[in-house]
Structures are given as C-alpha cells and as structure tokens.
C-alpha cells in the first residue's frame, strides 16, 4: 500500500520572541533573546527569577471575554496559535469535509495556573467555592476540544502528553492519522504555561534550570562550556497538516512535506538521557527510515538543545551515532537559546521554525555560545544564522521518562 503524503499548509506561533509567525521568525533569525526577569508572579523565595514569558498577547483577538474566562492561560496560547495556523492554511470547513478534519494539540503539564489558584481558594474558602469550570479549564485535551468546537471539526480529537516531546508526538501521530486515511487534515502541535510558582519552583528543585539571575538573556547557552541548565519558557506552536493531493486540489500554499517521523524510548532514567545518546540516535534513524532518505541527505537539525550539561553532550553523541561522518557536515542549532524550553510546546514551535528554515533556506543561530564545549564538537551555527541549502531537516524533542520524537521535514 502506498503511503499518503503529508504536507504542511498552515503555521501558528505564540512564544517568548513573538506573538505571531512573522515576528517570531524575524527575531529567531536575528538572534533576539526572549528571556527576561519574570513579572507575572512574585519570585520572592524562588531560586530562579527569570524565564521566557509570552509578552503582551491580546487574547481578545482570538477569544471572547466569556470564552477566555473559562480557560487556563495555556489554553489561551494553544487557541491563539491554533487559530493562526487555521487561518494561515485557508481551510474552509463544510458539512461534507468536517468529518475529515481533526485536532491534536497537547501540553506537557496543563493548567498549572488554574490548579494553583484553585488549591489556594480551596484552602481559604472550602470546596463550595471551586468553579464549575475548574476541570475543563485545566485539563490538557481542551485545546483540541475547543478548536474542534470553534470550527465544527468532527474528525479525530485528542491530545498526547509526553513531557517535552508532547508537541512533536502530536504532530507526528497526526501525520500518521492522515497517512492511514483516517483524516485529510489535522491541526497539531503543543502549548504550555508553566511559569508559575509550582512550575518554576519544581524545575528549580530538580536542578534542571539555569540560575543565571544576573544575566537572563545569556542564560540559555546550548553547547557552551558554562551552560548550567535550561530556561523555562511559555507559549504554543501549531501546524496544519494536510494530505498532499487534498492540499493541491484546493490550491493551498504548501510550506513543506512532513516526510518522516520517528520515536524511541531510552529505557534508562527518569530525567537523564541514555548514555552516548543511543535512544535519541535510534529516534533520528527511525525518522530517516520513515522518510526513505539516507543520513547523507540530511542538511539541518533543529536540536532539542536545552542547555543542560548532560543533554547537550548526549544529543551531540546521538547525531554522530545516527549520521556517522555526515554529522560533521550538517548544521545543528538550538532555537531554545532564544525562546527557552517550552516543554510541551517546544516541539510545536520548533516544527514551525524548522519548516521556515526550509522555506527560506536558512538555519537559525544558536546564540550565547561564548566558549564552545570541546565535548560538543559539531557545527551549531554559533551566534549567527546560516544561509544554506536545506532539502531535508529534522526537529528533535526528548522528554522526561526517556520519550523521544523526531519529525523530518522536506522541501517540496
């Protein structure tokens, strides 16, 4: 049976460097950091006092006040990015095609803001004061649910939750649904808003975060010898995936083809990557096999690249293991150096950035590489974007629990 081809026809982003695709991509290419001191919560007593917040998003452009009131902030971000992507695609939903359009937008953690506020309310005033909207405003699948309700989409409606791999797994599994013929169009990605007291405090307690409070803009420094952890970021990234012939028939603008998808498990440790990047390497190999390309055809990797001491070395080793000698010829950069780590939304925004890298034939930079770690010896597009030929690119996501995902996007 021949595989149905899947293409990308819509993009949407809300993130620390911009509230739409155009602004975000311009800032990414220019190496603009979105990391700054946190001002949405009181950081008194917090070890870490900075992050990658979404700035000045006017949610009224996307939701009515009544709708917005019933949703946690992470749903706001997911809806904004989802609506952007839907409008960018030019899709028209009709009675005849509604059952062939679905949604798969997840989050790694979900409605922390609502959960924390409700817990405080319960302690202060008791259970009777809990809002009837508490549960539907905080559970992860409600971005997909609200998107399907807004546009009358009657196809598959779900949300995968796999920590930092959430966005990539939602996009990858959505592509499989189209390949298998269960839908013609899927709106897919991830969202997150974890810059709350518990979110910030929890990751700091796990010693996962950079503590560079005196210089937030340079705190996320993948592959730099002085990296000391990741920077927490918020936002959402969503793509519209579409069966190739369906997209051509309606005259859609096609950004690129989602030609491959790979998954793997480290089966090693709750938070640390497997030794030598073995699990991540298998994941990348699986995506290339699924795309029917050889390692020497790959041009660019949008890395997981979180700026953690162990993770950056493991991903470097994984690229060498997956690509062999060709690893010395590709460019592998981390846009997290500018956005921070958006957890469940990371794979979503990075799928958008990888798609745009192919469209514009330019690799985003990894900023803040001041002194490259000798154990990380690949080409990371240090501090400056790189104009180059990109026919095939991988976007990597690796999450707590040893869950790995890679999508491979190709020029079309």
Model-identified regions with their sequence ranges:
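ACP-dependent fatty acid/polyketide chain-elongation machinery
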Residues: 1-67, 245-255, 352-366, 410-412
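Condensing-enzyme catalytic core mediating Claisen C-C bond formation in acyl metabolism
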Residues: 5-9, 36, 214-291, 300
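Conserved beta-ketoacyl condensing-enzyme motif
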Residues: 8, 29-162, 191-202, 295-311
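Active-site-adjacent elements of ketosynthase-type condensing enzymes
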Residues: 43-53, 110-114, 193-220, 262-282, ...
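Active-site-proximal alpha-helical scaffold in enzymes
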Residues: 78-91, 140-144, 148-151, 156-192, ...
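Phosphate/pyrophosphate-binding loops at sites that engage ATP/ADP/AMP, CoA/4′-phosphopantetheine
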Residues: 85-97, 247-254, 284-300, 322-326
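Glycine-/small-residue-rich "gating" segment that lines the acyl/pantetheine channel
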Residues: 124-131, 169-172, 176, 180, ...
């Amino acid at each position: 049976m021949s595989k149905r081809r899947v293409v990308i026809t819509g993009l949407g982003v809300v993130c620390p460097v911009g509230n739409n695709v155009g602004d975000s991509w311009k800032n990414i290419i220019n190496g603009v950091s979105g990391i700054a001191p946190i001002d949405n919560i009181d950081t008194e007593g917090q070890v870490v006092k900075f992050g990658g917040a979404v700035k000045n998003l006017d949610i009224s452009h996307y939701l009515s006040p009544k709708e917005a009131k019933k949703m946690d902030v992470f749903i706001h971000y997911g809806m904004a990015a989802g609506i952007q992507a839907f409008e960018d695609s030019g899709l028209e939903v009709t009675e005849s095609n509604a059952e062939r359009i679905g949604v798969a937008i997840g989050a790694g953690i979900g409605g922390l803001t609502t959960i924390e506020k409700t817990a405080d309310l319960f302690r202060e005033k008791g259970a009777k004061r809990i809002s009837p909207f508490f549960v539907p405003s905080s559970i992860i699948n409600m971005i997909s649910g609200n998107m399907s309700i807004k546009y009358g989409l009657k196809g598959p409606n779900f949300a995968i939750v796999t920590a930092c791999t959430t966005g990539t797994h939602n996009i990858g599994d959505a592509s499989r649904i189209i390949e298998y013929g269960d839908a013609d169009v899927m709106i897919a990605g991830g969202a997150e808003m974890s810059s709350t007291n518990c979110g910030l405090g929890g990751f700091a307690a796990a010693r996962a975060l950079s503590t560079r409070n005196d210089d937030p803009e340079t705190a996320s420094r993948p592959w730099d010898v002085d990296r000391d952890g990741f920077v927490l970021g918020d936002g959402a990234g969503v793509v519209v995936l579409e069966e190739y012939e369906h997209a051509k028939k309606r005259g859609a603008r096609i950004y690129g083809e989602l030609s491959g998808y790979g998954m793997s498990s480290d089966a090693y440790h709750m938070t640390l990557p497997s030794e030598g990047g073995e699990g991540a390497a298998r994941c990348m190999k699986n995506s290339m096999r699924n795309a029917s390309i050889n390692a020497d055809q790959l041009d660019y990797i949008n890395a997981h690249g979180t700026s953690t001491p162990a993770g950056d070395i493991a991903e470097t080793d994984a690229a060498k293991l997956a690509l062999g000698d060709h690893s010395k010829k590709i460019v592998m950069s981390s846009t997290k150096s500018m956005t921070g780590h958006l957890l469940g939304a990371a794979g979503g925004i990075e799928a958008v950035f990888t798609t745009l890298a192919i469209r514009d034939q330019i690799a985003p930079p990894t900023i803040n590489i001041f002194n490259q770690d000798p154990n990380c010896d690949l080409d990371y597009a240090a501090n400056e974007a790189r104009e180059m030929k990109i026919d095939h690119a991988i976007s990597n996501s690796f999450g707590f629990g040893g869950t790995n995902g890679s999508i491979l996007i190709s020029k079309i």
